[in-house]
């Protein structure tokens, strides 16, 4: 696809806006159906028909903070939403294998295996984005793989993790001495080398290879983690709140709690991570509250996974 520069409703073949795209180009049909936000700059619209745009990337632009924003067609968004159900089930089915991998590597003498064990334990604890070196260089944003020793501070009997991630969001996590992650993380920290990477023996390739053995992607763990955390918050709220607020209010509260834990906005939690089928189930089962009061969290998770699986196979 060719990329056209957009300006004031017009398309151009060059960034200097000297070569206008002919009005007969089918890309103009797309502009009749989409609204490009006025606050975006450096907007690029991709050449395609309107029908093609329904399932593809349509345009890209920079927001007021210089962050690149991507806008997709309706069918692409629908597919992405339905994929969250599949991801949740897929990760849930292998999460015990992932925990066993952590058990087998977290105290390993081999530095690479040990660091992979700590990496996976941190990921399944906090569901942090992986982070790439190119993003660190381009935007000075940090992820799990690009954490440095200076991002980890030991204070009394706890470890504080502090870094600036995607979209300049500040992340803070605490690892208490009673946490399983505490001792392995202490072993990993290089206090004399603050600017060195925490996981200096790992690379994107090594991490991807380790995760691929479970038939998932690393980003799937974050999607699973957001849903798992949301469901735990919802279950806990049902158990602890009295009187019980309306379901939609409790969903909203649980989403906000989840966003605070994971480190993004409630809107992003709901729009980009939480499986729609999960929300559907919580909203439409009139007996759910009474059911949750009498079951454990593991039993609640089984209810959710059974519902998603049955919905997918209808």
Curated annotation (Swiss-Prot):
Domain of life: Viruses
Catalytic activity as recorded in UniProt: ATP-independent breakage of single-stranded DNA, followed by passage and rejoining
Annotated gene: TOP1
Transmembrane region(s): none
UniProt keyword list: DNA-binding, Isomerase, Late protein, Topoisomerase
Similarity remark: Belongs to the type IB topoisomerase family.
InterPro entries for this protein: DNA_brk_join_enz, DNA_topo_I_N_sf, TopoI, TopoI_C, TopoI_cat_a-hlx-sub_euk, TopoI_cat_euk, TopoI_N_vir, TopoIB_AS
Enzyme category, top tier: isomerase
Full protein name: DNA topoisomerase 1
Domain Topo IB-type catalytic: 73-314
Physiological role: Releases the supercoiling and torsional tension of DNA introduced during the DNA replication and transcription by transiently cleaving and rejoining one strand of the DNA duplex. Introduces a single-strand break via transesterification at a target site in duplex DNA. The scissile phosphodiester is attacked by the catalytic tyrosine of the enzyme, resulting in the formation of a DNA-(3'-phosphotyrosyl)-enzyme intermediate and the expulsion of a 5'-OH DNA strand. The free DNA strand then undergoes passage around the unbroken strand thus removing DNA supercoils.
Site, as annotated: Involved in religation: 167
Keyword Ubl conjugation among record annotations: no
GO MF terms, alphabetically ordered: DNA binding; DNA topoisomerase type I (single strand cut, ATP-independent) activity
Single biological process term from Gene Ontology: DNA topological change
Keyword DNA repair found: no
EC number of this enzyme: 5.6.2.1
Active site (UniProt): 273 (o-(3'-phospho-dna)-tyrosine intermediate)
Source organism (scientific name): Rabbit fibroma virus (strain Kasza) (RFV)
């Amino acid at each position: 696809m060719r990329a056209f520069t957009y300006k004031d409703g017009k398309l151009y073949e060059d960034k200097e806006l000297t070569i206008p795209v002919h009005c007969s180009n089918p890309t103009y049909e797309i502009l009749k159906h989409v609204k490009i936000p006025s606050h975006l700059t450096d907007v690029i619209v991709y050449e395609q028909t309107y029908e093609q745009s329904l399932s593809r990337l349509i345009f890209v632009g920079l927001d007021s903070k210089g962050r690149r924003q991507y806008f997709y067609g309706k069918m692409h968004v629908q597919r992405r939403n339905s994929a969250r159900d599949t991801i949740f089930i897929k990760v849930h089915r292998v999460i015990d294998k992932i925990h066993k991998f952590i058990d087998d590597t977290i105290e390993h003498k081999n530095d690479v295996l040990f660091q992979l064990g700590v990496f996976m334990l941190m990921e399944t604890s906090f569901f942090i984005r992986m982070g790439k070196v190119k993003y660190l260089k381009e935007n000075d944003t940090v992820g799990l793989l690009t954490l440095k020793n200076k991002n980890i501070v030991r204070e009394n009997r706890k470890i504080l993790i502090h870094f600036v991630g995607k979209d300049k969001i500040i992340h803070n996590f605490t690892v208490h001495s009673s946490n399983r992650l505490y001792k392995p993380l202490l072993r990993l920290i290089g206090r004399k080398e603050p600017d060195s990477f925490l996981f200096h023996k790992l690379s994107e390739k090594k991490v991807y290879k380790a995760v691929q053995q479970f038939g998932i992607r690393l980003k799937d763990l974050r999607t699973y983690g957001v849903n798992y955390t949301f469901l735990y918050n919802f279950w806990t709220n049902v158990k602890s709140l009295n009187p019980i607020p309306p379901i939609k209010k409790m969903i909203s509260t649980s989403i906000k709690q989840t966003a605070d834990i994971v480190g993004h906005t409630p809107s992003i939690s709901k729009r980009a991570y939480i499986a729609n089928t999960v929300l559907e189930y919580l909203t439409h089962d009139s007996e759910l509250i009474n059911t949750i009061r009498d079951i454990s969290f593991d039993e609640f998770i089984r209810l959710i996974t059974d519902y998603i699986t049955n919905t997918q196979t209808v």
